[in-house]
């Protein structure tokens, strides 16, 4: 996925779970453009994970085993809402 193609990133944020949509959509709308290219790549990697994993990480039921992705989870949770 292209880092600068915001439409594709927004589309990838559309998940099968409303709880994830509520986190990802505001993050993309309000924060994604200001991320470094490295963090954009990391966010896209996060979007490639399965919904049940993402749900568990974002709801705090499990800790993401990948430290880089875990950092992005914290960043999204902390900055998704305006």
From Swiss-Prot:
- The primary site where this protein sits is cytoplasm
Where in or outside the cell it occurs: the entry states: Cytoplasm
Where does it sit, as one GO cellular component term? cytoplasm
Fetch the InterPro entries from UniProt. Answer: SDH, SDH_sf, SdhE_FAD_assembly_factor
BP term (GO), one: succinate metabolic process
Q: Key word Cytoplasm present in the record? A: yes
| Keywords attached to this entry | Chaperone, Cytoplasm
Which SUPFAM superfamilies does the record match to this protein?
Answer: YgfY-like
Q: State the function annotated in the UniProt record.
A: An FAD assembly protein, which accelerates covalent attachment of the cofactor into other proteins. Plays an essential role in the assembly of succinate dehydrogenase (SDH, respiratory complex II), an enzyme complex that is a component of both the tricarboxylic acid cycle and the electron transport chain, and which couples the oxidation of succinate to fumarate with the reduction of ubiquinone (coenzyme Q) to ubiquinol. Required for flavinylation (covalent attachment of FAD) of the flavoprotein subunit SdhA of SDH and other flavinylated proteins as well.
Q: Which family does it belong to?
A: Belongs to the SdhE FAD assembly factor family.
Q: What is this protein called?
A: FAD assembly factor SdhE
Q: Which gene encodes it?
A: sdhE
């Amino acid at each position: 996925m292209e880092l600068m193609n915001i439409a594709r990133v927004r589309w990838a944020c559309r998940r099968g779970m409303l709880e994830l949509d509520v986190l990802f959509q505001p993050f993309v709308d309000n924060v994604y453009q200001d991320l470094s290219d490295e963090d954009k790549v990391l966010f896209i990697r996060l979007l490639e994970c399965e919904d049940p994993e993402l749900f568990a990480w974002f709801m705090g039921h499990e800790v993401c085993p990948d430290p880089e992705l875990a950092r992005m989870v914290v960043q999204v949770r902390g900055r998704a809402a305006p």
